Amino acid sequence: MSTPSATVAPVKRIPYAEASRALLRDSVLDAMRDLLLTRDWSAITLSDVARAAGISRQTIYNEFGSRQGLAQGYALRLADRLVDNVHASLDANVGNFYEAFLQGFRSFFAESAADPLVISLLTGVAKPDLLQLITTDSAPIITRASARLAPAFTDTWVATTDNDANVLSRAIVRLCLSYVSMPPEADHDVAADLARLITPFAERHGVINVP
């Protein structure tokens, strides 16, 4: 008697156009990052980035719209790293909110402090265009990063409600972005402070669904 074969769930494939666009954006942003390692943002043009990425200036314009749009795309990717760090730290510290937040925040702040665009923002000539991206014009970054971060609280051991996950996500993204534009003193452990601030809410509203 033969046993029924296990049903294999179909692999969700990313449409070609979507995958191609993501690859293009990453290639352009990687090229921009490489340029920022040796030049200040104020000295970089769309043509410079296009040459470094091996594509036309028009292609960059079509994808990002402008030099400011390119900077916003870079900032969005940096915010994605915050989401990835917090999600990974929750996976690595099941049942321990404080350690999860502490690890996630420390990883993000270390990465952002070493990021060439952030360094360019904080050094050299004033760059109001970059500062606007994470202050007055930060809504797109906050909205996207918060939406991506929320499932880390609803779909993991934390198991909050959607509403509480949104509260946590927005607070984390807004607070972390504020420290990118105005870093704390060198002897101040802001990651620990934020972990202490966020943990009580998460402990109160999370189910902590640990097997």
Curated annotation (Swiss-Prot):
The lineage of its organism: Bacteria, Bacillati, Actinomycetota, Actinomycetes, Mycobacteriales. Homodimer. Contains an N-terminal DNA-binding domain and a C-terminal ligand-binding regulatory domain. The C-terminal regulatory domain can bind saturated fatty acids. DNA-binding activity may be regulated by fatty acids. Disruption phenotype: Disruption of the gene affects the expression of about forty genes. The mutant survives better than the wild-type strain inside macrophages. It also has impaired biofilm formation, due to overexpression of the alkB-rubAB operon. Mutant does not show significant difference in the transcription of mmpL3 and mmpL11. Represses the expression of the alkB-rubAB operon, which encodes the alkane hydroxylase AlkB and the rubredoxins RubA and RubB. Acts by binding to the promoter region of the operon. In addition, EMSA analysis show that AlkX can bind to the promoter region of mmpS1 and mmpL3 and to the intragenic region of mmpL11, suggesting that it may participate in the regulatory network that controls the expression of MmpL lipid transporters. Its main location: cytoplasm. GO terms for cellular component: cytoplasm. Residues 45-64 bind DNA. It is found in: Cytoplasm. This is HTH-type transcriptional regulator AlkX. Keywords: Cytoplasm, DNA-binding, Repressor, Transcription, Transcription regulation. One of its GO terms (biological process) is regulation of DNA-templated transcription. Residues 22-82 form the HTH tetR-type domain. One of its GO terms (molecular function) is DNA-binding transcription factor activity. SUPFAM superfamilies: Homeodomain-like.
